[in-house]
Curated annotation (Swiss-Prot):
<keyword id="KW-0645">Protease</keyword>
<keyword id="KW-0378">Hydrolase</keyword>
<keyword id="KW-0732">Signal</keyword>
<dbReference type="InterPro" id="IPR018044">
    <property type="entry name" value="Peptidase_S11"/>
</dbReference>
<comment type="pathway">
    <text>Cell wall biogenesis; peptidoglycan biosynthesis.</text>
</comment>
<feature type="signal peptide">
    <location>
        <begin position="1"/>
        <end position="22"/>
    </location>
</feature>
<keyword id="KW-0573">Peptidoglycan synthesis</keyword>
<dbReference type="InterPro" id="IPR012338">
    <property type="entry name" value="Beta-lactam/transpept-like"/>
</dbReference>
<keyword id="KW-0961">Cell wall biogenesis/degradation</keyword>
<feature type="active site" description="Acyl-ester intermediate">
    <location>
        <position position="69"/>
    </location>
</feature>
<dbReference type="GO" id="GO:0009252">
    <property type="term" value="P:peptidoglycan biosynthetic process"/>
</dbReference>
<dbReference type="GO" id="GO:0006508">
    <property type="term" value="P:proteolysis"/>
</dbReference>
<keyword id="KW-0574">Periplasm</keyword>
<dbReference type="GO" id="GO:0009002">
    <property type="term" value="F:serine-type D-Ala-D-Ala carboxypeptidase activity"/>
</dbReference>
<dbReference type="InterPro" id="IPR001967">
    <property type="entry name" value="Peptidase_S11_N"/>
</dbReference>
<dbReference type="GO" id="GO:0042597">
    <property type="term" value="C:periplasmic space"/>
</dbReference>
<feature type="active site">
    <location>
        <position position="124"/>
    </location>
</feature>
Length: 291
């Protein structure tokens, strides 16, 4: 449940900087006196403490955008709730009929839930998402389970329309930077998810034995202390990301949505690193509220 304070209460309780004239839901917020956070491609973002749930700063963190493949974290949570990692499914043609990114699921081949989770979280396989949905009772049933899980977690602005995050008959879906962090925190509390999202690579079945699949979260290579994340992109969502990093005994989580990368400007990874660096440099007692 959101516990972010209103702008008035925040100013009374703990000196917060809010953009002039903006409502709390549509404001830049960070502790007063803290170093200004540079702009970057993401139009909405949030920085929070992964363990305590304290929000360190945000920009339009409650404004909804399509989540793209970051919604796969929610699918993974449902799968981990309901499936044995060693349970198997034989993929059918419908599972593989997906706009790629794909991990290489083949009709007629048997896969374990764990293999599909690797393909889902490391390379954002839409075919893996479809096949997990197959295991969970079909696309419609799975989407309903995902939305029920989001509601249970307090991610009340999140609405999945497909298991993969691709546009579906119900549109592009929606989430917020706040909700993506709430969902990712819950996922990181699951040891299997935390292990998979931190893997730099894994092996996945192919026609020629096992093939190496490489984690698309470039922060694992670029940012010391990165411990996992999930990327996303569609034309409607633009660039999205949610992920976590650890330093000095602290763990922070960020979410970034609707990234508009400009030629010559900072990349999405640059902005992610900036948000983490800013958060780790902030006094651990400073915050603007809680998730």
């Amino acid at each position: 449940m959101r516990k972010l304070m209103t702008a008035t209460a925040a100013l009374c309780a703990c000196a917060v900087t809010v953009s002039a004239g903006a409502a709390w839901a549509d404001a830049d917020v960070q502790p007063a006196g803290s170093v200004p956070i540079p702009d970057g491609p993401a139009q909405t973002w949030i920085v929070a403490d992964l363990d305590s749930g304290q929000v360190l700063a945000g920009r339009d963190q409650n404004v909804a955008h399509p989540p793209a493949s970051t919604i796969k974290v929610l699918l993974a949570l449902v799968a981990l709730d309901e499936l044995d990692l060693n349970s198997t499914v034989v993929a059918d043609v419908a599972d593989t009929q997906a706009e790629c990114n794909c991990v290489g699921v083949k009709p007629g081949r048997s896969y374990t839930a764990r293999q599909l989770l690797d393909g889902l979280l490391l390379v954002s396989g839409n075919d893996a998402a479809n096949t997990l949905a197959h295991m969970l009772g079909g696309q419609d049933v799975t989407v309903a389970k995902m939305n029920a899980k989001a509601a249970t977690l307090g991610a009340t602005s999140t609405h999945a329309t497909t298991p993969s995050g691709l546009d579906g008959p119900g549109g592009s879906g929606a989430s917020t930077a706040h909700d993506l962090v709430v969902i990712f925190r819950a996922a990181m509390a699951n040891p299997v998810f935390a292990q998979i999202t931190a893997e730099p690579s894994a092996m996945f079945p192919s026609d020629n034995g096992e093939q190496l699949i490489v984690n698309q979260d470039e922060l694992l290579q670029r940012y010391p202390g990165a411990i996992g994340g999930k990327t996303g992109y569609t034309n409607a969502a633009r660039k999205t990301f949610v992920g976590a990093a650890a330093r000095g005994g602290r763990r922070l989580v960020i979410a970034m949505m609707y990234g508009l990368v400009k030629e010559g400007g900072p990349t999405y990874w640059d902005q992610a690193a900036t948000l983490f660096d800013w958060g780790f440099a902030l006094n651990p007692q400073a915050s603007v509220g809680s998730l």
